[in-house]
A protein has these predicted regions:
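Envelope-exposed proteins and targeting segments
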Residues: 35-37, 49-53, 82, 120-122, ...
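A mature extracytoplasmic/lumenal domain signature
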Residues: 43-45, 56-59, 69-71, 90, ...
Length: 153
């Protein structure tokens, strides 16, 4: 009985990870370095010179996932996802999360953790790559990098 309940709960989490009924499928997915952690890029849209990355983290593990694993290890803001960056292989450029005048990231922040057996919808903003760039790499600390993530404009 317990196995059926856990299986049903994980199936529900996977639906949340995939988005609501009728929602578009993620444009890219990857696994975390730790077992039971996955990430799905919902979209990467460019408007007005800014790229917005929307993504979901799914924690199927038995322990919470601390957001500090996704922060910038050098100048990062605790409880944020400011360690994410984009890689433009064609132009050999790395795009970091945009920061405001107070050096706070324009990203999901003031976060604690993704609870066990749950998911979280997150976002981050970057300088827009040139119009000629149609796909880009997305690197999230402690997740396998994703190459060729499509950019919508």
């Amino acid at each position: 009985m317990r196995g059926k309940i856990i299986g049903a709960a994980l199936a529900g989490l996977w639906l949340a990870f995939s988005g609501p009924a009728g929602a578009a499928e993620p444009v890219a997915t990857t696994d975390g370095e730790a077992s039971g952690i996955r990430l799905a890029v919902q979209d990467l849209k460019v408007a007005n010179g800014v790229a917005t990355l929307r993504f979901t983290v799914l924690n199927e593990a038995d322990t919470p996932l601390n957001y500090n694993t996704m922060r910038d290890p050098n100048n990062g803001e605790g409880g944020s996802v400011d360690g994410i960056y984009l890689i433009d292989a064609a132009n050999k450029k790395k795009y970091l999360v945009v920061k405001d005048a107070d050096k706070h990231c324009l990203c999901s922040r003031n976060l604690e953790h993704v609870a066990s057996k749950s998911s979280a919808n997150l976002w981050a903003k970057f300088p827009a790559p040139p119009d000629s760039v149609q796909k880009i790499g997305v690197v999230v600390p402690h997740f396998i990098p994703m190459d060729d993530v499509p950019i919508s404009r």
